[in-house]
Amino acid sequence: MAATPHRHLLQPCKNPAISSSETLKPSSSFSLSSNPSIPLIRRRLPTFRCDFQNRRKWMNVDHHISKLNPIQIVPNSRRFQMSSNQENSVEFSKKVCLFYCPETKALAERIAAQSDAIQLRSISWRTFEDGFPNLFISNAQGIRGKHVAFLASFSSPGVIFEQLSVIYALPKLFVASFKLVLPFFPTGTSERMEDEGDVATAFTLARILSNIPISREGPTSLVTFDIHALQERFYFGDNILPCFESGIPLLKKKLQQLPDSDNITIAFPDDGAWKRFHKQLQHFPMIVCAKVREGDQRIVRLKEGDPTGRHVVIVDDLVQSGGTLIECQKVLAAHGAAKVSAYVTHGIFPNKSWERFKPDTAGCPEEGMTHFWITDSCPLTVKMVKNRPPFEVISLAGSIAAALQI
């Protein structure tokens, strides 16, 4: 037996508020348009009024059109345009209260400048006479039910405790959600044990962060950039959600702005850097260097690729003493590189090791670098190298502001 058509398909739609004898007036809210090139069976009314206040009642619209030419609803009201604009700005629709430590104040201000949806909140960072922290979160009741984030900088063991005290306290203030932004994960290079008795401090810090109290919406989200080893994501427990971001997209934008952007070649100082970043830089020619041991020394050699006549940019996740980058620079220059630059997401530079890098002012790539790009993930380093060639700082503010909306 054939199925009986639905009763709404057999009868015209009816609305008690509109009779069949009444003339429907054109509406300023919506208009119906059809393609004049396709003939219609019958078209009596060009426009009709949509009664949203009585949307559950059926309207009597005697309007026959071709099945091949469906009605197009064209928005022309100011109210609809406003809603469209809101959809276009959905990237920053979530309002976030951003706290920060003293080291990250400048970065926090740059993040807040990205969007009006990010509001800076203050914390009083004081100490007792014995040196232990005396902390106070201003207007604690004002963040109830709101999305809260904290911008941290674990630049030294001494500041970790006071920041952890705040990090553990914020989720307990009845906030809707809590996000920890730690641009540089400081113990990332201590992720493995080679001898019995070695302590993997990366695992220790991951366990500490994994025990941050949950907020009303669930576990804490952790945003960090270019962590040293991707397998460190498995160090974190189930009570934290790591979000691993990268500064490489910012580097690619910077390289596109160079006058010799079509002559760029990417070099990796070792296999680890190649495995970490080569997929994000596939459209560039690549060079891979390798560390080899000769006697008691470890030297850098060219493993594959040709730097002759190219502007070679060395890419790695972090730099400390800078010895590997300098050796790589010398090898590339010896093999004919026209220019040598470098990029690292995290410029740590303990003991002012940044002073080892000189600018190339005479066209001698073996003596200096054309550019040395770092991000502002390590605020103390940014203060030291500011306005000192060849260093240039690429800010993570835009990337962090976008991550706060996740």
UniProtKB/Swiss-Prot annotation:
Location within or outside the cell: Mitochondrion
Chain intervals with Low complexity compositional bias: 18-32
Keywords for the protein's UniProt record, in alphabetical order: ATP-binding, Kinase, Magnesium, Metal-binding, Mitochondrion, Nucleotide biosynthesis, Nucleotide-binding, Transferase, Transit peptide
GO molecular function: ATP binding; kinase activity; magnesium ion binding; ribose phosphate diphosphokinase activity
Residue ranges the record marks as coiled coil: none
Reactions the enzyme catalyzes: D-ribose 5-phosphate + ATP = 5-phospho-alpha-D-ribose 1-diphosphate + AMP + H(+)
Pfam families: Pribosyltran (PF00156), Pribosyltran_N (PF13793)
The protein's Enzyme Commission number: 2.7.6.1
Root EC class: transferase
A biological process from GO: 5-phosphoribose 1-diphosphate biosynthetic process
Transit peptide as recorded in UniProt: 1-87
Superkingdom of origin organism: Eukaryota
Region spans: Disordered: 1-32
GO cellular component: cytoplasm; mitochondrion; ribose phosphate diphosphokinase complex
Region (Binding of phosphoribosylpyrophosphate): 309-324
Binding site for Mg(2+): D226, H228
NCBIfam families in alphabetical order: ribP_PPkin (TIGR01251)
Family stated for the protein in its record: Belongs to the ribose-phosphate pyrophosphokinase family.
Official protein name in the record: Ribose-phosphate pyrophosphokinase 3, mitochondrial
Gene of this entry: PRS3
